[in-house]
Amino acid sequence: MSALSLPAHVDVPFGAGNKGSVVEAEFSVAKRKTYTFYLNLYFMEGDAQNKERVRKLAGTGAYPDGRQIDTGLAIPVRLRVERIGNNGASSILDRIFTDHDREGMAADHFSKLITRIWLEPGPYRAKVEALENIPELEDISVHFNLLVAHDRGGP
């Protein structure tokens, strides 16, 4: 099985609360699809107090009238996505994101959406940079995550 036949997936620790912290990851896209970029905020399993604190930072995830009630803690990041080619890299996305809707929850983390973008097959590099010092994230494990978007009928 070649690297291009594997689904794109990135999951790396990221110092989202430390200004200037940067993580970079290379990945391959096999099929033209929408890919989702997240910040995952982890909580300690079995610690209800810690889970509730992280939930407040992640926001409510509720959508009255199609809008989020509370996006939680603003986590300003700059996301750059480049397609890697024989003649170097070409920019696909270079944008600052501040407020992230809480989009989901797993057994050990809450997911805050950065963005979704269509990617064509090929090799890519994603780089995310923290733009502010955020004391509330000091003892929270945050991961930068990328995966194929669930089909929601939109872009």
Task: Say what each PLM segment does.
Residues 1-155:
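Acidic, Ser/Thr/Pro
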